[in-house]
Amino acid sequence: TLGRQALSLGSARTISPTDVFLPFDLRVLDTEYRPGVDAIRFERSLGDLSMIDAGWIAGAEGKPEESAWFGRWITNARGVDLAATWIERPDYRLAGFAANGAAGQFGLWWAAARVSGRESYWRSSIGIDGGFAATGLWMLELHYNGAGEQDVSRYLATEHPDAYQIFGVFLLARRYVLTGLSAQLSGVTSIAAQAILNLDDRSSFFQASFDRYLSDAWSVQAGYYRFD
């Protein structure tokens, strides 16, 4: 595939350590539409359960020092999806691994990535999800951000500025709990909620939403946000 395209290398539900190619400007409000990244991409099946995905991502204005090569191998072993990811830049290297599976009625996942180069750090996410009341879903994820700081006073004086400017890290602390749930109350009504807890400074973010379709042309949406 040649041209602008969506590119996701992550597998965690909320924060994926290997999703580092950002096709939008972090300084502006995030929007539903994201234009994609300019890339040359090759995908090939290696059988019924395996494939390789590799390519080149163009940096700003095609600058070689800001461009990157990537490779990803995906397979399935005894019902568990496995993925190994490699990203190479002139100044950085990322090696990642992810596993997704199930235990009974619960979904399980784990993903980790090691960045080395001018800055070195680990990032990892592990989580579980499941269903309730026929139409409801819930999830719980723990995230470790090795690029962050445990001391609040150092949030804006981080030792890993490139993690935020190049690799799309946006959380400032190191340890987080993320949870969420959603439910379809009827064919036209749904609710959802998500919470993020910072275990280092005990701050938190909570959001909830309500959606109801009144007709093909009209709908009602309401949201609630809280930072503590």
Model-derived regions: residue spans:
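Residues on the lipid-exposed face of transmembrane beta-strands in outer-membrane beta-barrel proteins
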Residues: T1, I40-R44, G71-T75, F97-G101, ...
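Repeated loop/turn-to-beta-strand initiation elements of outer-membrane beta-barrel proteins
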Residues: T1, L49-I52, A77-A84, Q105-W109, ...
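Outer membrane beta-barrel
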Residues: T1-M51, I57
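Transmembrane beta-strands of outer-membrane beta-barrel pores
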Residues: R4-S8, W56-A60, A77, W86-P90, ...
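Outer-membrane beta-barrel translocator domains and adjoining extracellular loop/strand segments
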Residues: R13-D19, K63-F70, A95-F97, E119-S125, ...
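Extracellular loop and loop/strand-boundary signature of outer-membrane beta-barrel proteins
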Residues: D25-V28, A58-G59, W69-F70, V115, ...
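Residues that define the transmembrane beta-barrel architecture of outer-membrane proteins
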Residues: R34-D38, E65-W69, N76-R78, D91-A95, ...
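Extracellular/periplasmic loop regions
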Residues: A98, G107-Q184, A192-A195
